[in-house]
Amino acid sequence: MSDPMKTALSLVPMVIEQTNRGERAYDIFSRLLKERIIFINGPVEDGMAMLVCAQLLFLEAENPKKEISLYINSPGGVVTSGMAIYDTMQFIRPPVSTLCMGQAASMGSLLLTAGAKGHRFALPNARIMVHQPSGGFQGQASDIERHAQDIIKMKRRLNEIYVQHTGQGYEVIERTLDRDHFMTAEEAKAFGLVDDVIHYRAETEKEEKD
């Protein structure tokens, strides 16, 4: 059975631009990167995290003050991969705006709420899901015990991050994340995961004058 993600990527459209040196072709994602737009699409894993972190660092080097937009449609994935993206978002100087389109579940929801305060958005039909980390281990009993201790520490750290970005109390976060907890865009706003639900893009000053 073919991988839907690979199939989609093989169909990425090209954009042709006219420059003073003639025509130049970009794939659509490279063209959007020029506009400081990065996509997190699909499961969060090491390969994706490396690409997202590289794009964040590149855009910081290009302009350390101009906002970066992160568009998220992800079911979540590997915690350490997500934390690599999270730490890079906090590390770089430009503010990072986040927007959920489709879904932001598990690590996707953490990256959504990690955007700059006042710049975290969701589209009206987006779904957000939060929960505690999960894992399965095998081996010697002592190793399983150590893995269990580590995932408990990881759970505590993730809870602290949600507390920091949502403004909710630790007990509320712990209770909410105890099981899969699904939210509409408006519910995510009320909970503090996002700052606003966007129904349409506002006109710019230039567009209004035109």
From Swiss-Prot:
InterPro entries reported in the protein's UniProt record: ClpP, ClpP/crotonase-like_dom_sf, ClpP/TepA, ClpP_His_AS, ClpP_Ser_AS
Record Gene3D superfamilies: 2-enoyl-CoA Hydratase, Chain A, domain 1
EC top class, as a word: hydrolase
Keyword flag Hydrolase: yes
Residues annotated as the enzyme's active site: 106, 131
GO biological process: protein quality control for misfolded or incompletely synthesized proteins
PROSITE patterns, alphabetized: CLP_PROTEASE_HIS, CLP_PROTEASE_SER
Transmembrane segment boundaries: none
Keywords of the record: Cytoplasm, Hydrolase, Protease, Serine protease
UniProt-annotated location(s): Cytoplasm
UniProt keyword Hydrolase present: yes
UniProt catalytic activity: Hydrolysis of proteins to small peptides in the presence of ATP and magnesium. alpha-casein is the usual test substrate. In the absence of ATP, only oligopeptides shorter than five residues are hydrolyzed (such as succinyl-Leu-Tyr-|-NHMec, and Leu-Tyr-Leu-|-Tyr-Trp, in which cleavage of the -Tyr-|-Leu- and -Tyr-|-Trp bonds also occurs)
Any Pfam family hit: CLP_protease
SUPFAM superfamilies associated with the record: ClpP/crotonase (SSF52096)
Gene Ontology CC terms, in alphabetical order: cytoplasm; endopeptidase Clp complex
Family statement drawn from the similarity comment of this UniProt entry: Belongs to the peptidase S14 family.
Alphabetical list of HAMAP family matching this protein: ClpP
Subunit architecture: Fourteen ClpP subunits assemble into 2 heptameric rings which stack back to back to give a disk-like structure with a central cavity, resembling the structure of eukaryotic proteasomes.
Name the UniProt record assigns to this protein: ATP-dependent Clp protease proteolytic subunit
Organism: Bartonella tribocorum (strain CIP 105476 / IBS 506)
Upper taxonomic lineage: Bacteria, Pseudomonadati, Pseudomonadota, Alphaproteobacteria, Hyphomicrobiales
